[in-house]
Amino acid sequence: MKKIIFCFLYLYTLNVFGASKIDHNKLNSCSITRNIFNNYEPKVFETTNNLLRKTGTLSKFYGEMILIRGKILDQNCVPVTDAKVYLWQAGNGGKYPYEPLKTRVDKSRFTNKSDSSFTGSGIATTNNKGEYYFISMLPYKSPRYLRNANIRIEHPNLTTLETRLDLFDKNMCDNECGEISPILIETKKNIPSYCFDLVLQGTTLKRY
């Protein structure tokens, strides 16, 4: 009887360690970024990643220039290439400088009478490393409205994500990362950067 019990425990131990080895070979798993929705997205997005001006015009804005950047990953931590990234935010005065998509919103949050070139919206496409970046400005801060931007990521193979980016000191980049336009770096030094790595539900790698 003791021999039978010993053999059973031995085989069970082999199965446990065998399963653990298989687990170690699995792809990494990233925590999926949660959705936080915003009702103030624009009716029409500007088609550039520079929110400080329209394409072909000079920039004239009132506030501090910043970079918003990071990586888009799938749930296996694989960088997502060619994802469409939409960003929108209020300007220095706390208002959105465009016409909203939705009609049942607080109209006092919008303005079309500013002499600033700040557009409040833009679009970027991730590179082959899953990286994106936007040129923007630090939004208005008050007891009622915190400094944040809104982002939506779309990819044909992944679940669309919409969330909020809190522009707090804790989210500032620790070091230089990602590919940024050399023209921007040459003309402006020490631009405050906020980094956000976002994870979408789904996988981009095909199984064969």
From Swiss-Prot:
Pfam families: Dioxygenase_C. Keywords: Dioxygenase, Oxidoreductase. It is an enzyme of class 1 (oxidoreductase). Its EC number is 1.13.11.-. It comes from the Bacteria. GO terms for molecular function: ferric iron binding; oxidoreductase activity, acting on single donors with incorporation of molecular oxygen, incorporation of two atoms of oxygen. SUPFAM superfamilies: Aromatic compound dioxygenase. InterPro entries: Intradiol_dOase_C, Intradiol_dOase_core, Intradiol_RC_Dioxygenase. Belongs to the intradiol ring-cleavage dioxygenase family. This is Putative dioxygenase RP396. It comes from Rickettsia prowazekii (strain Madrid E).
